[in-house]
């Protein structure tokens, strides 16, 4: 990318251990505090409940960036709606409301290295090597 930019990583988790439903957001490390006046693009793997992206968006918006956009690889279709509504500017794929693994998405630390994104099997422990 031929543009000057600063890339920051923030780790927020909401699925501890073997949980397959969100347990609330936990921030590990910290949120950059020098984003006032900057153009910010949040890139996330998956939009599910909306809680983690909602939290991050509020924390960054409080710093008054020049612009704030959100991109997600996957957005789960929620028939009943999300816990928190988050406007997303860019979506790679819309998926059904199922727990998915692979290509960086994990289940208790496993399956992150799979080359594809697939639905978590009903009894995932039997697939662990």
What are the functions of these language-model segments?
Residues 1-129:
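PRPP-associated nucleotide enzymes
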């Amino acid at each position: 990318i031929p543009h000057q930019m600063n890339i920051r990583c923030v780790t927020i988790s909401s699925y501890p251990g073997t949980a397959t439903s969100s347990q609330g957001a936990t921030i590990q490390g910290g949120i950059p505090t020098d984003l006032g006046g900057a153009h910010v693009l949040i890139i996330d793997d998956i939009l599910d409940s909306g809680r983690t992206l909602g939290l991050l968006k509020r924390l960054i918006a409080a710093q008054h960036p020049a612009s704030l956009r959100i991109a997600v690889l996957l957005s789960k279709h929620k028939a009943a709606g999300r816990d928190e509504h988050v406007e997303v500017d860019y979506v790679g794929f819309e998926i059904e409301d199922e727990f998915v693994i692979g290509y960086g998405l994990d289940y208790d630390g496993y399956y992150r290295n799979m080359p594809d994104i697939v639905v978590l099997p009903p009894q995932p422990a039997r697939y662990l090597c």
